[in-house]
Amino acid sequence: GRIGRLVARVALQRDDVELVAVNDPFISTDYMTYMFKYDSVHGQWKHHELKVKDEKTLLFGEKSVRVFGIRNPEEIPWAEAGADFVVESTGVFTDKDKAAAHLKGGAKKVVISAPSKDAPMFVVGVNEKEYKPEYDIVSNASCTTNCLAPLAKVINDRFGIVEGLMTTVHSLTATQKTVDGPSMKDWRGGRATSFNIIPSSTGAAKAVGKVLPALNGKLTGMAFRVPTVDVSVVDLTVRLEKEASYDDIKAAIKEESEGKLKGILGFTEDDVVSTDFVGDSRSSIFDAKAGIALSKNFVKLVSWYDNEWGYSSRVIDLICHMASVA
């Protein structure tokens, strides 16, 4: 899917990780090449010439990447391809038992690119230091949790969060419908994406309590799916323990964005809109002009994220962190 392809794009642009193999049981190698090369959101791939060497090998410039088309994860020969880390981005194998099938093929670690009900969840910049080498299967949480958690961490560390509600205004994704169609578990989710604002559930705010235990039970939220193809925005409305002016809050976020959270949390005072963040690799970019305070204890904070590119960048960051700890 899109995250798998974009994780591959991110990996190929970085020196600290090597892409050695991809698995997709549903498409041919030449179609895989086409899907990788042309992207309606992120544009054409321009970094290496991409060629099909044969049906089991892609060439990115001189670099060869093995291609598998195996449906059952335990049959994929990851070890033979030299893969240490597998990114499980099908959206199907999101619990530990299912994702563990990759280990049977010789992978050493599996990173699930979705929230997981039972795998340890990590948000880079927030709790990745709690990763231990004995964890073989981990989750990179969701794109929205990756946007919300760094912001919530800064606010909670500096001012304390009594409680909060989050809304994400979220671009459409592949699970939605182009025209009205059946969606048994989520009736609204079956409505046409291109001209509806669709209220939806999200576990992203509650999941912050898993990566930041101090906030467990203090946050919840919902989503509106809107007809944009990429980039989403979190609205976090919180009650603060310590009184703070909006300028105090801005200053704290700016300081963290230039310090420990540089590259993860951004800060802007420009008059930005969503397309300004297409291709932004940061998890969360605080929009200082969009937020507003009602009082010294009650404030609405707004933060943007490229829910595809930013998230895919964090998948690779998490892998690099895991490798450094091993």
UniProtKB/Swiss-Prot annotation:
This is Glyceraldehyde-3-phosphate dehydrogenase, cytosolic. The lineage of its organism: Eukaryota, Viridiplantae, Streptophyta, Embryophyta, Tracheophyta. InterPro entries: GlycerAld/Erythrose_P_DH, GlycerAld_3-P_DH_AS, GlycerAld_3-P_DH_cat, GlycerAld_3-P_DH_NAD(P)-bd, Glyceraldehyde-3-P_DH_1, NAD(P)-bd_dom_sf. Its EC number is 1.2.1.12. It is found in: Cytoplasm. D-glyceraldehyde 3-phosphate binds at S142, C143, T144, T173, T202, G203, R225. Pathway: Carbohydrate degradation; glycolysis; pyruvate from D-glyceraldehyde 3-phosphate: step 1/5. SMART domains: Gp_dh_N (SM00846). Belongs to the glyceraldehyde-3-phosphate dehydrogenase family. It comes from Nicotiana tabacum. One of its GO terms (cellular component) is cytosol. One of its GO terms (molecular function) is NAD binding. It holds the Pfam family Gp_dh_C. The record marks H170 as: Activates thiol group during catalysis.
